[in-house]
Amino acid sequence: MKILEIIPQLSSGGGERFVVDLCNELSKEHDVTLMVLHSLDKVDFYLKEVSNNVRVVSMNKRMGLDIGLLFRVYRYIRREKPDVVHTHLRAIMYISFAIMRKNGVMYCHTVHSAADKEAGGSFISSGMRKFCFHRQIGRPSGRERV
């Protein structure tokens, strides 16, 4: 199975630690790519702990809301054709365009903090998270997602 894990950055947080551990374990039996939205030049706290079996891709997100990143992430998903796209933290807002064009990909999102903290932000980012929520991306649906 091809799995794409997406996280904003590899800073020293608990969500980041979880994603690195998850990628390392999944890579024992699956083809795993870890997409980091921000540049690895700035924050790479956990990069050395990512298994050599995990492909790491940096999308070099610009400061603030990077609209172009929506399309770069979509093109990457379309080109690589993962079976599962799993977002973490605030990365969910950058897969909204890809979700609209599903193409047989299973999307899921993990909330790593209090939901109200993660749901904050600008009108655009909170709107994108609501869009994903209404399409059952990142909320329980009564059946296992991955």
Task: Identify the meaning behind each predicted range.
Residues 1-143:
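Membrane-interface segments of envelope glycosyltransferases acting on lipid-linked substrates or membrane lipids
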